[in-house]
From Swiss-Prot:
Induction field: (Microbial infection) At least 4-fold induced following infection by Sulfolobus turreted icosahedral virus 1 (STIV-1) in strain 2-2-12.
NCBIfam families: orc1/cdc6 family replication initiation protein (TIGR02928)
The name this protein goes by in its record: ORC1-type DNA replication protein 3
SUPFAM superfamilies named among the record's database cross-references: P-loop containing nucleoside triphosphate hydrolases, Winged helix' DNA-binding domain
Keyword Ribonucleoprotein among UniProt keywords: no
Keyword S-adenosyl-L-methionine: no
UniProt keyword list: ATP-binding, DNA replication, DNA-binding, Nucleotide-binding
Source species of the chain: Saccharolobus solfataricus (strain ATCC 35092 / DSM 1617 / JCM 11322 / P2) (Sulfolobus solfataricus)
Amino acid sequence: MHVIRETLKGGKGEVIKNPKVFIDPLSVFKEIPFREDILRDAAIAIRYFVKNEVKFSNLFLGLTGTGKTFVSKYIFNEIEEVKKEDEEYKDVKQAYVNCREVGGTPQAVLSSLAGKLTGFSVPKHGINLGEYIDKIKNGTRNIRAIIYLDEVDTLVKRRGGDIVLYQLLRSDANISVIMISNDINVRDYMEPRVLSSLGPSVIFKPYDAEQLKFILSKYAEYGLIKGTYDDEILSYIAAISAKEHGDARKAVNLLFRAAQLASGGGIIRKEHVDKAIVDYEQERLIEAVKALPFHYKLALRSLIESEDVMSAHKMYTDLCNKFKQKPLSYRRFSDIISELDMFGIVKIRIINRGRAGGVKKYALVEDKEKVLRALNETFEDSISIGDFDDVGEN
């Protein structure tokens, strides 16, 4: 009982000084290290757009945790501040959309953009793509709009996604676009007419161990109590994260989790970091599953029962019927499986059995137990474990 009281009060042995540093770093950090050149070039392009009506389109490319989203949101916030100081920026309107989080379809992305730019709710269904574009044009008339499309690869890999980009980039409205993608090959999915409208790609190189250590030292300085960590701990976390393509997001998450585990003990030790690594990998998979759109979850649940994609589609169709959802075609279902493979949740295998057996597509779910638990937690209000077990038995 007394332990709970001490924890609630944050007394003896506390490690974390300001958790907001880890949860909302943009509210604390006024500079972004190792990305100064990218920020300067982006600022110049934005200034030309606002003051000289020279439109731009940038594609931010880099692996997870290399600062693409952080830089984009930092730019967004800085523009909002400049609007208070410079009259020429007064009519600049911005819209940030994570394509995957809104569903990834052209309709969902355009609906979200139109809503943010017009200030009105725009339906995701029942409107053709041209009408969405018209709403966006009307919402940006006599102003300058900067659109941020995060995880844009989710959009361009969908049917019609290229049309959205082409319409936005070639629109006669005053719109400039910053696109963000973890998939460094995303341009391969774009049609030539879209590529011809794109500006140069901006590559975010992975952070090395020394850069990660510097970043961690800043988070520790602002977020942790002095004396609760040492240089060796920061170096250890930086070295681990540098091995995984220089992922700063992972490094910061590990430091925060290790600090939470050390709470009450007064100092972060190596065993706290090792435990944080295990927790991080589990949470990353679970959160990825929970963030999936509804039909992706049904597809994933079907794959747990059958690795054969054709058979899994039949089970998926049964699930859709059971829960009064219109099933997607096998082609679209197969596309979803490919996206799940891209997310690292499943691994696809193509087996050619010769002329007699043909080609069969299989998808192995990574860590079935954790994925199943995440699905059950997600569906606990609408779909029980028993509901899944009944599918296919009729």
